[in-house]
Design a protein with these regions (language model features):
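Conserved N-terminal segment of class I S-adenosyl-L-methionine
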Residues: 1-178, 188-191, 256
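Conserved catalytic loop of SAM-dependent methyltransferase domains
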Residues: 18-24, 252-270
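Hydrophobic/aromatic residues located in beta-strands of well-ordered beta-sheets
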Residues: 142, 204-206
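Feature marks short, surface-exposed loop/turn motifs that line or immediately flank catalytic pockets
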Residues: 151, 211-214, 258-260
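A short His-aromatic
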Residues: 179-183
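Short N-terminal helix/helix-N-cap motif within the alpha/beta-hydrolase-1
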Residues: 185-189, 216
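A short glycine-rich, Lys/Arg-flanked "PGG" loop and its adjoining helix->strand segment in the class I
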Residues: 188-203
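Short, glycine-/aromatic-enriched active-site segment of Class I SAM-dependent methyltransferases
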Residues: 206-233, 238-243
């Protein structure tokens, strides 16, 4: 009988097998869904987990060259767009530049009390795609960490380190985990560490697939977001509430992604 690592439940836990699909690597992996909090958990984490993150193929490690070396004029235009969408500096130019499809992160950042000089950490950032996009839009104090990148990256005032979350000592005004929390073992210890890395009255953003979703109910073990064995936990809203309370966070907002049926949770540590 499997015991849930989130709520401790042992009753009515459903066990099932999932295959690795992204790279068609050999192997099947045993998961279970907690009958109480509905968190989906990988039972045995492979000792060679890094082999399932091939640096030349894994999507988050592929960085477009135009994100690293943007033109100064283009950056100035993008900053006008950021002023309009994030910081509500309304003007005609910002309005025109914001017509049409814009990057989703504008909707996340306008919810938190930050500015262009705020210290921002992206945990599990891969090659830094999002950080370089933010740099193009005017943000100046950007840090990322990822244990699976080949080496540190220092380009255009964006600093990305090959390290684990428990190796970080600095504190930050805002921390993001964009589809990385589901890759991390010991989720409660991770949240407690993140709590300690935030400055007072700061915010943590976690974007994850959630188990209490239409896609899990509809596709079952064929749901792409299971992503065995890279996803160690597929949390539910209930499991995230349990963890956040134990770590000392207060949940300020929960947003369900319409396109991917994924969840976004915004926490504050004070």
């Amino acid at each position: 009988m499997q015991q849930c690592k989130i709520c401790g439940n042992k009753e009515n836990n459903n066990t099932f097998l999932v295959y690795e699909h992204m790279f068609r690597l050999k192997g099947e992996f045993e998961y279970f869904e907690c009958g109480n909090c509905h968190c989906i958990q990988l039972i045995n984490i492979p000792s060679n987990l890094a082999d399932y993150y091939p640096s030349s193929h894994y999507y988050s490690f592929n960085l477009k060259e135009n994100l690293i070396n943007p033109g100064s004029l283009a950056n100035a235009i993008r900053k006008i767009q950021s002023d309009h969408l994030i910081f509500k500096k309304r003007n005609l130019a910002g309005f025109i530049l914001s017509i049409g499809t814009v990057h989703p992160y504008f909707n996340w950042l306008k919810k938190v009390p930050i500015d262009y000089h705020s210290s921002i950490l992206d945990v599990g950032c891969g090659g830094g795609d999002l950080l370089f996009r933010m740099r193009r839009h005017g943000f100046e104090n950007l840090t990322g960490i990822d244990p699976f990148i080949e080496k540190d990256i220092h380009v255009n005032r964006v600093n990305i380190y090959k390290k684990e979350i428990f190796d970080v000592q600095e504190t930050f005004d805002f921390i993001m985990l964009n589809h990385s929390y589901e890759h991390m073992d010991q989720p409660l210890l991770v949240l407690k560490k993140l709590y300690g890395l935030l400055k007072p009255k700061s915010y943590l953003l976690i974007r994850i697939p959630i188990s209490n979703s239409y896609c899990w109910q509809q596709y079952g073990t064929y749901w792409a977001a299971l992503d065995a064995p890279r996803h160690l936990y597929i949390h539910s809203e209930q499991s995230m509430k349990i963890l956040s309370e134990k770590a000392g966070f207060e949940i300020k907002d929960i947003i369900h992604g319409k396109k991917e049926r994924r969840g976004m949770e915004l926490f504050t540590n004070r």
